[in-house]
Amino acid sequence: MSDFEPFYDVSRSYEDNYEQGPFGAFAEALKDGNGADAAGTTSEGASEGALATFLGQPVNLPFGIPAGPLLNSRFTTAAFHMGFDLATYKTVRSRAWGCNPFPNVLAVHPKSADGSLTPGSAELDEGVLADTNYEQPISISNSFGVPSQSPDVWQPDMRAAIEAAGPGQVLVPSFQGSRVEGMSEEEYIADHATTARLVKETGAKLMVMNTSCPNAVSYTHLRAHETSLHLV
């Protein structure tokens, strides 16, 4: 690993990152209050100098961090302080949802010198070497299972994350529905709506539905292929 210290520490569990993170420069930004207003100035009524808009919201620069590594309000606030004007709050659910077993992130090492995978290569069937040798440049594979705190935890924390946005900055909540054993398709769709309503209750001005994990229900049944569900 290089001297660069990531703000999400892959050598720690997801739970430890949630409780103790962020790390590195993000931790320093959170401690020192560098960058955007560290006092938690809200962006409402204070974005006259914004240079662009994102889904109708004024932003300084429509560039940020997508759903994934910003686990809670400490992470999103640190991202704001580091100058990312769009910070996406890690995908939430209508219920608590555990993380997949550790380790959740591994470096992958294709055999080719340039790191590419060739059509027809045996690696496509046999897999590639995956380990904790995080050398630069780096390619990774990850498996978290889209964990979530319960709404009793994430709703107040999301409110704090929204309030920490500075002028020209926007907190973007991410959400998804949860499919559990015995749930009908109608109930699955309704769970998406329930989770969106829970997000709206935090005062969020916009939100994004996470469809990046189409195999979250079954490794052989991709929900994203079912246009009949009318999730959007």
Range-by-range predicted roles:
Residues 71-79, 188-197:
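Short, acidic/polar
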Residues 154, 188, 192, 228:
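Aromatic/hydrophobic pocket-lining residues that form the small-molecule binding cavity
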Residues 1-170, 177-180:
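N-terminal capping/small domains of soluble enzymes
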Residues 175-195, 223:
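Short, electropositive alpha-helical surface patch
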